[in-house]
Amino acid sequence: MNTNIKTREYTTISEVSGPLMVVEGVEGVGYNEIVDIETPNGEKRSGQVLEVTDDVAVIQVFEGTTDLNTKNTKARFTGQTAKIGVSRDMMGRMFNGIGKPIDGGPEIIPDEELDINGSPMNPASREFPEEFIQTGISTIDGMNTLVRGQKLPIFSGSGLPHNELAAQIARQAKVLGDDAEFAVIFAAMGITHEEANFFMRDFERTGALEKVTVFMNLADDPAIERILTPKMALTTAEYFAFTLGMQVLVILTDMTNYCEALREISAARDEVPGRRGYPGYMYTDLANIYERAGRIDGKEGSITQMPILVMPQDDITHPIPDLTGYITEGQIVLSRELNRKGIYPPVDVLPSLSRLMSGGIGGDKTRDDHSGVSDQLYSAYAGGRELRDLVAVVGEEALTERDQKFLEFAEEFEGKFITQSKDEDRSIIETLDLGWDLLKILPKSELKRVKEEFIEQYLPKE
């Protein structure tokens, strides 16, 4: 064995498998410790300790194990956990999944070095989320409102325009009536080069890059880097929010790729699989990410999360959306049926939900009629959708005049309220006024979920 007490350097590599490397005869090694690795040809790589049993350490290699062998590879344990250097200068910059600049700009001179695992928020010090965030998307702002400090995921399907929606939210999101600086941190995991180019071009074209910090992990990057990307992004968000006092929106896409990387590494470690082959600790791992959203009593800033995940086979009961739903505070569901009709964004409001919406709307936050309008739109659209199924059986001629109105409302709701262009940024007032304009289609006697005073004040006169 070739070891050095000071540097703890080892050449006792016993196995190299997938993204993992096993080192024997180690002493004083800790979980999550960072390891400097030197390949036989002198190349420098980094890794992290996944597991320590007696004198054996299992290391995940960030850059992959290609060209590593058991004879001429060196591993040096640093005694440090993974950290990222953070600074205000990260605004408007692009980094890879492990925090290295990829935009051709200079290296970041950090104000602080922070552990990427963060520190848990004391539940007693959390403030309840209750400030409205305007995304400019009517189906979100009007009916599934995003609130500052909330975690609200978007459930999508393969081929649906979640990337376009994510880019639009990153461009348009803002906190109304708040002088605090607003920042967006965009973390992409396992995306293709085509998708990466789309996001880069979109942010640059619209000028949104000034307020966006991007962490980009590509599909051909190592899976272990994918595990670090959301932690890098959230650590930066915590610095912006709780040190610099910014209002931060974190968009994480695609959490399905993150979970696939978890499964790949778990399989390489020969762990006992859980549901559908995913590791049993996936719930805990996802909770560690999602629970880093929130507000802290006495701190100006906040972290709001919008994780995006693609449901395999559009299955909302799949372990990834299923576990995400347990941890987060609602969901925005994209519909393949609406997408086939050419509707963008194809948000299906009926299965969508924002559990914290009630605390962030009404009065001086949005408008006093917001809750009633939202409830009435839900009710009327649900009625119209039910009648569509009936029409398929009995035909439209069998419907009453009242039913015809609800059917017309459903069509107009999809064509005018849900549908908007990819560059259209609707204010909450425009969204609510549009809702009232559509409710005018229905007989006034059917508007049972809004107060009479609001009907008199806001319903357009014939």
From Swiss-Prot:
Subunit structure: Has multiple subunits with at least A(3), B(3), C, D, E, F, H, I and proteolipid K(x).
Record InterPro entries: ATP-synt_VA_C, ATPase_a/bsu_AS, ATPase_F1/V1/A1_a/bsu_N, ATPase_F1/V1/A1_a/bsu_N_sf, ATPase_F1/V1/A1_a/bsu_nucl-bd, P-loop_NTPase, V-ATPase_su_B/beta
Membrane association type: Peripheral membrane protein
Function (record text): Component of the A-type ATP synthase that produces ATP from ADP in the presence of a proton gradient across the membrane. The B chain is a regulatory subunit.
Keywords of this entry: ATP synthesis, Cell membrane, Hydrogen ion transport, Ion transport, Membrane, Transport
Keyword DNA-binding attached: no
GO biological process: proton motive force-driven plasma membrane ATP synthesis
Main location: membrane
Annotated Gene3D superfamilies: 3.40.50.12240
Pfam families: ATP-synt_ab, ATP-synt_ab_N, ATP-synt_VA_C
Entry-linked CDD domains: ATP-synt_V_A-type_beta_C (cd18112), ATP-synt_V_A-type_beta_N (cd18118), V_A-ATPase_B (cd01135)
Subcellular location: Cell membrane
Database matches in PANTHER family: V-TYPE PROTON ATPASE SUBUNIT B (PTHR43389:SF4)
Organism, as annotated: Methanobrevibacter smithii (strain ATCC 35061 / DSM 861 / OCM 144 / PS)
GO-annotated molecular function: ATP binding; proton-transporting ATP synthase activity, rotational mechanism
GO-annotated cellular components: plasma membrane
Family: Belongs to the ATPase alpha/beta chains family.
Name of the protein: A-type ATP synthase subunit B
Phylogenetic lineage: Archaea, Methanobacteriati, Methanobacteriota, Methanomada group, Methanobacteria
